[in-house]
């Protein structure tokens, strides 16, 4: 869960950096996976207004836009279709850098000049993994010509927490504020929930709620009259964007804001769209159809809990509202829903419907039903603060099985014995009180009142854990234990080294071993520039000779020597690998050099770049690094500028692979193309996930469709595959490249790329109409993102 650092500081006085807080929270049991700075990479992207839109004369799906960027008018050619004249959108100008590192240049699209590119949330790095089709449309009052990072408040730090299933109370900013306050020995502030009722009408006179199923633990509602739907204020939009949620309008934003802040999902119904005064919570009937807010019609069964208006379904309980009752621009009266539903039922239905939302992800973890009242009060307070409506009198509250606080009694001496500590009862009380576990000391006994939101505190061991983590595991003294000496197990590096070796051998490679000392002249042979940092080497005081006088900073010369030696002995097909170290000197000569563990792969004879890439992909698979990607690079002087790639995982470079530069081949006396990969094993091991998980064989068949695409030469295979998978979603099981063609019938500067795409749904047999819908979506995404055209057969 992503928690903006600035939002956290609204509730706790924090006197440390986000990184320091992340470390402290991780030590106290709230694991922070990473601290990210949203939008830090993007450059030269500004807000603009589209003044005029015309059809491209030579391309049906392209439009020519005249754009005001404040300082001048420019022309942008786009394939997007969700904008209109006078809309304000982000535009990446010539030289701009997108969130993924892509650079934007001025160019021509089908003969028309385009001075940049309009941007979506994805290009800005704020889509948060959600699928985005179309441009990001900014509010009408957005200024023109302002840096988008300044306007959206990017460059802000966000803490990404790993929340376990037994801590639903931490699925909110307030929950993490409570943990932060306890960890830093501070107090936290509750958000404002006070408001004034200004409408004399009572919701209980207008709405009746009936709950016909025990799957609904609690259902609360409150009415708002004289609603004014408008964009949210900037501060609220910034909070939502920082947390990865797109602002929509003030009413919807309030429900999303409360969900993120307190952890309680909410929904707002347009009162005029409710067909009667009766709201009924009950199960759907088998075969019922319902169109959700994402404009998709879904077929329901009798397991799905629904909210009905007496005549028809208006929401899927705990999952998503309906298109028929959502808040619109002209909505004037709403009903706020704050409810609590059975977590198991929500989880099953969410999975069966293929609809996992922020709401369902919280309900499925069994959030506290008593949170519903607090959230409803908070939403009404925000309505008053934003001046977007008048709160009606009365509250509807159907709460049949009230959940109450429980009491635990635990011995102080038992906790000390269990933890190996000698803490005073008062110290334990401070730790527990800071977590809202209200504690009373009665002699050697702690009497703890456990709030309903702490479903994980149930036995005395749970209490001891809370004391230990807030007191600080690092503050508990270490003690020696008596034990027998056993053979030391292999560490992670040794086990991974063995896995790498096994993978290389299984790929048909032979292991080679070379000296770590080399000649300074090898850098000339691999065409390293004179000012390169690779020439900054550790010198050996008593070398065996000139050829072994320095420690290597690159393993490429060693591999090229091995390949050249084999070539000189007429070995026509060679497949080698080596695991060795490089030695990078530190600025302080008295310090030891930095050693990096490098895997070098070298092949030649009856092979090409894709053979080398396949070997590397096998390695990535064995190390659990499937999310790594290949990015074209041309600045490495030792490699062929058009046939070289950088291996990247996130923002970390894992190495380089490609064809060796012809000049380097000539320097080593090799007349055939050589392909080499230099991979940083230390970096790969940091990300390695080698655990195996059971996955049952698929019950339903896969269906394969072939597509042949016409794309620019500069478009990478990786970009195409990424676009296919992102647009296709979970039903795309496999994307396999089977043909790359240039030649007759292919325009100059273009290439034909052919893929076989396998579609499979784990929950049902896909029909042609299902596949056609996804297939068409993929083609649209490829055209929009990469300018790809379906090649005519």
Curated annotation (Swiss-Prot):
Protein name per its UniProtKB record: Phenylalanine--tRNA ligase beta subunit
Enzyme class of the recorded protein, top EC level: ligase
Cellular component GO terms, alphabetical: phenylalanine-tRNA ligase complex
Cofactor info, note text: Binds 2 magnesium ions per tetramer.
Gene: pheT
Enzyme Commission numbers on file: 6.1.1.20
Annotated tRNA-binding domain residues: 39-149
PANTHER family: PHENYLALANINE--TRNA LIGASE BETA SUBUNIT, PHENYLALANYL-TRNA SYNTHETASE BETA CHAIN AND LEUCINE-RICH REPEAT-CONTAINING PROTEIN 47
Main location: cytoplasm
UniProt keyword list: Aminoacyl-tRNA synthetase, ATP-binding, Cytoplasm, Ligase, Magnesium, Metal-binding, Nucleotide-binding, Protein biosynthesis, RNA-binding, tRNA-binding
Naturally occurring in which organism (per UniProt): Clostridium perfringens (strain 13 / Type A)
Subunit structure: Tetramer of two alpha and two beta subunits.
């Amino acid at each position: 869960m992503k928690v903006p650092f600035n939002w956290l500081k609204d509730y706790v006085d924090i006197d440390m950096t986000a990184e320091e807080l992340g470390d402290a929270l991780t030590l106290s049991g709230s694991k922070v996976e990473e601290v990210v700075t949203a939008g830090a990479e993007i450059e030269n992207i500004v807000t603009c207004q589209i003044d005029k839109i015309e059809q491209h004369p030579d391309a049906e799906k392209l439009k020519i836009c005249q754009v005001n960027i404040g300082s001048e008018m420019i022309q942008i050619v786009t394939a997007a279709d969700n904008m209109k004249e006078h809309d304000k959108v982000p535009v990446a100008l010539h030289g701009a850098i997108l969130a993924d590192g892509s650079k934007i240049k001025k160019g021509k699209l089908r003969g028309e000049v385009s001075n940049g590119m309009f941007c979506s949330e994805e290009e800005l790095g704020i889509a948060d993994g959600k699928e985005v089709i179309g441009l990001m449309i900014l509010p009408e009052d957005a200024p023109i010509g302002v840096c988008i990072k300044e306007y959206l408040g990017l460059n802000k730090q966000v803490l990404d927490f790993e929340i376990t299933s037994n801590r639903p109370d931490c699925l909110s900013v307030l929950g993490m504020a409570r943990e932060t306050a306890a960890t830093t020995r501070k107090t936290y502030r509750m958000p404002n929930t006070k408001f004034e009722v200004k409408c004399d009408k009572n919701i209980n006179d207008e709405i009746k709620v009936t709950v016909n199923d025990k799957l609904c633990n609690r259902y609360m509602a409150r009415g708002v009259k004289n609603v004014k739907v408008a964009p949210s204020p900037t501060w609220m939009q910034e909070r939502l964007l920082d947390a990865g949620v797109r602002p929509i309008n003030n009413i919807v934003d309030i429900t999303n804001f409360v969900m993120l802040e307190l952890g309680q999902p909410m929904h707002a119904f347009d009162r005029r769209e409710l067909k009667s005064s009766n709201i009924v919570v009950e199960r759907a009937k088998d075969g019922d159809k319902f169109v959700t807010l994402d404009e998709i019609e879904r077929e329901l069964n009798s397991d799905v809990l629904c909210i009905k208006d007496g005549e028809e379904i208006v929401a899927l309980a705990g999952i998503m509202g309906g298109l028929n009752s959502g808040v619109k621009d002209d909505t004037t009266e709403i009903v706020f829903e704050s409810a609590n539903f059975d977590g198991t039922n929500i989880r099953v239905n969410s999975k069966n419907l293929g609809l996992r939302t922020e709401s369902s992800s919280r309900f499925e973890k069994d959030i506290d039903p008593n949170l519903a009242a607090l959230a409803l009060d908070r939403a009404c307070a925000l309505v008053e603060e934003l001046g977007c409506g008048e709160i009606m009198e009365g509250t509807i509250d159907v709460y049949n099985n009230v959940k109450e606080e429980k009491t635990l009694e635990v011995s102080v001496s038992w906790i000390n014995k269990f933890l190996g500590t000698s803490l005073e009862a008062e110290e334990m009380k401070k730790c527990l009180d800071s977590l809202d576990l209200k504690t009373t000391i009665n002699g050697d006994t702690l009497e703890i009142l456990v709030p309903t939101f702490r479903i994980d505190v149930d036995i005395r061991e749970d209490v001891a854990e809370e004391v230990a983590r807030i007191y600080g595991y690092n503050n508990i003294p270490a003690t020696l234990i008596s034990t027998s000496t056993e053979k030391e197990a292999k560490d992670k590096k040794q086990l991974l080294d063995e896995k790498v070796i096994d993978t290389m051998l299984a790929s048909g490679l032979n292991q080679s071993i070379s000296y770590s000392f080399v000649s300074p002249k090898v850098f000339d042979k691999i065409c390293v520039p004179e000012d390169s940092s690779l020439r900054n080497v550790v010198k050996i005081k008593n070398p065996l000779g000139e050829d072994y006088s320095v420690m290597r900073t690159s393993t490429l010369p060693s591999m090229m020597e091995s390949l050249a030696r084999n070539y000189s002995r007429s070995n026509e097909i060679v497949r080698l690998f080596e695991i060795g170290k490089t030695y990078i000197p530190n600025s302080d000569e008295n310090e030891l050099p930095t050693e990096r563990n490098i895997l070098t792969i070298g092949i030649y004879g009856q092979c090409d770049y894709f053979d080398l890439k396949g070997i590397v992909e096998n390695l990535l698979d064995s190390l659990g690094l499937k999310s790594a990607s290949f990015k074209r690079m041309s600045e490495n002087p030792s490699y062929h500028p058009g046939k070289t790639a950088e291996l990247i995982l996130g923002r970390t470079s894992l190495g380089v692979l490609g064809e060796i530069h012809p000049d380097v081949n000539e320097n080593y006396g090799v007349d055939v193309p050589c392909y080499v990969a230099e991979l940083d094993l230390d970096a790969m091991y940091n990300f390695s996930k080698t655990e195996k998980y059971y996955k049952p064989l698929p019950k339903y068949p896969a269906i394969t469709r072939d597509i042949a695409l016409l794309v620019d030469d500069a478009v990478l295979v990786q970009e195409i595959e990424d676009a296919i998978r992102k647009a296709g979603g979970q039903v795309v099981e496999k994307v396999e490249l089977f043909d790359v063609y240039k030649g007759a019938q292919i325009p100059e500067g273009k290439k034909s790329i052919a893929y076989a795409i396998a579609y499979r749904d784990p929950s049902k047999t896909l029909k042609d109409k299902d596949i056609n819908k996804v297939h068409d979506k993929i083609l649209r995404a490829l055209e929009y993102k990469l300018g790809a055209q379906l090649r005519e057969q």
